Amino acid sequence: MFSDYLKDISWEQTTEAIYSKTDADVRRALAAEHCTVDDFMALISPAAAPYLETMARLSRRYTEERFGRTISLFIPLYLTNSCTNSCVYCGFHISNPMKRTILTPEEIENEYRAIKRLGPFENLLLVTGENPALAGVDYIARALDIAKPYFSNLKIEVMPLKAEEYEQLTHHGLNGVICFQETYNRDRYKIYHPRGMKSRFEWRVDGFDRMGQAGVHSIGPVSYTHLRA
């Protein structure tokens, strides 16, 4: 599991390795046909600052080679803002005095119809807070079932699930999962997520392994850049 891999990584040694990279290391990484982890450290090091435009051009070239000159749009739809976590940066924080809403099946379908009136959108991202008791797997499965006649590509951004739960949702039309990981630094993770299910670091980072085990087609890990790692 990914959490086991993280245990073997020293933040101090990794930081030292990044800051020790030289101009020659950066140029070697830019010329490499396939980058290694060591090459990646060179490209995010202070020594790479003069090469930002070069990296931008390479990034554009590789992106066009992989995806073509296309733009793919998706619509995010919040099914509920109910959440049992206490993430310090989030407006859904359980202690925030705000009205909590969980859309009913009828309200969900009304939202789908409204989205289709906006344009020919086919990619839908269903988003929830973390409240498995009130908006758990069965609720998400129902939302996916309702969405299938309207959209061809269905993704979710919800609480981390068990492998068998991800697999269950694939049978309801799930194509992909997006999961935000605010930091991979275990100590700082505790500061940002003091209470709730999301405070379980290993459960969170190992979610990507469980998605793969379940056969989820598209797995999208996202990392915030404004939180100190």
Give each language-model segment a name.
Residues 55-96, 100-124, 175-176:
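N-terminal pre-triad scaffold of radical SAM enzymes
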Residues 1-74, 85:
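Flexible, acidic/Gly-rich N-terminal and inter-domain linker regions that tether
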Residues 118-208, 213-218:
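Conserved SAM/AdoMet-binding glycine-rich loop
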Residues 225-229:
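Conserved small/polar residues in nucleotide/adenosyl-binding loops
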Residues 221-223:
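Acidic, proline/serine/threonine- and glycine-rich low-complexity intrinsically disordered segments
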